[in-house]
């Protein structure tokens, strides 16, 4: 596992799962650096039509920056103020196939936030893109759309040769929660890459399928985590916390011995606190 995890926020288990399982280094680095490098767009007052116009007609740098700002500015439900927004964004998306890939990547986020299933075919087409990160963003957006029609193609993505694509596909399939994905989620439990297995197990656990339990339990085992090449200490803590979020919900009181062990003996205060919270939730 070579990509770093993002700093994990304290707000909710949902945030922890989302932040931990996704975003390889290239995506994170771009997102973190944008405000430092390109503050002009952020500091000016822009409306959604302004961003759309800049994406259409700006310079190469201005276009992807505007796409990023639009993805950050648009709130779920706000699209109702702009009846043709999905159509406009989808049109720009289709026309930007040969442009800076960041334009399509950030517009994928916009389409996901809009939440209109008419965007599903556009995003499914993006799963054929040569850019790995573009495929990842499209999968994330499809997970947000929760359109069952996307599941067959996303199942194919779960068998992709790139581990980050597989990882994201499993996460997004869990978001859609369509029973037709269960078989591929089960197959993902045997993936050769640890965090791909974890994503498959996390998604499968949402179906209350106990076949996910053995893989989830490995996330609570520091000895097992120590065998994963290049895994940093903070990533190990992240895995433990995510595992303690999901595993007890699946197996109930069976998780108590593991949680008690972690709560009393883990070297990380952050992990011990998470174990105590998980124990309290069992009571």
Language model regions located:
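Hydrophobic membrane-insertion alpha-helices, especially the h-region
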Residues: 19-39
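Amphipathic alpha-helical scaffolding segments comprising HEAT/armadillo-like alpha-solenoid repeats
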Residues: 41-54, 76-95, 116-128, 147-159, ...
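Short inter-helical turns and helix N-cap capping residues of alpha-solenoid HEAT/ARM repeat scaffolds
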Residues: 58-59, 99-100, 130-131, 161-162, ...
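Structural signature of alpha-helical solenoid repeat scaffolds
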Residues: 71-72, 112, 143, 174, ...
């Amino acid at each position: 596992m070579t990509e770093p995890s993002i700093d994990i926020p304290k707000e909710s288990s949902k945030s922890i799962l989302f932040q931990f399982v996704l975003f390889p280094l290239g995506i994170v680095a771009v997102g973190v650096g944008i405000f430092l490098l390109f503050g002009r767009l952020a500091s000016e007052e822009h409306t959604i039509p302004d961003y759309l116009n800049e994406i259409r007609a700006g310079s190469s740098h201005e276009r992807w920056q505007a796409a990023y700002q639009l993805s950050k500015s648009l709130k779920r439900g706000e699209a109702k103020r702009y009846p043709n927004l999905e159509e406009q964004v989808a049109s720009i998306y289709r026309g930007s196939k040969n442009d800076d890939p960041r334009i399509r990547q950030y517009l994928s986020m916009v389409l996901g936030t809009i939440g209109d299933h008419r965007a599903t075919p556009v995003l499914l087409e993006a799963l054929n893109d040569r850019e790995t990160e573009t495929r990842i963003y499209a999968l994330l957006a499809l997970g947000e759309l929760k359109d069952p029609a996307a599941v067959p193609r996303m199942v194919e993505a779960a068998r992709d040769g790139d581990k980050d694509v597989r990882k994201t596909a499993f996460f997004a399939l869990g978001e859609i929660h369509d029973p037709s994905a269960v078989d591929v989620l089960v197959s993902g439990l045997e993936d050769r890459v640890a965090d791909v297995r974890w994503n498959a197990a996390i998604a499968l656990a949402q179906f209350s399928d106990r076949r996910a339990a053995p893989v989830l339990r490995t996330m609570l085992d520091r000895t097992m985590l120590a065998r994963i090449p290049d895994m940093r200490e903070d990533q190990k803590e992240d895995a433990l916390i995510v595992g303690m979020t999901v595993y007890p919900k699946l197996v109930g009181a069976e998780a108590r011995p593991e949680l008690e062990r972690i709560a009393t003996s883990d070297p990380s205060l952050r992990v011990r606190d998470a174990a105590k919270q998980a124990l309290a939730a069992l009571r």
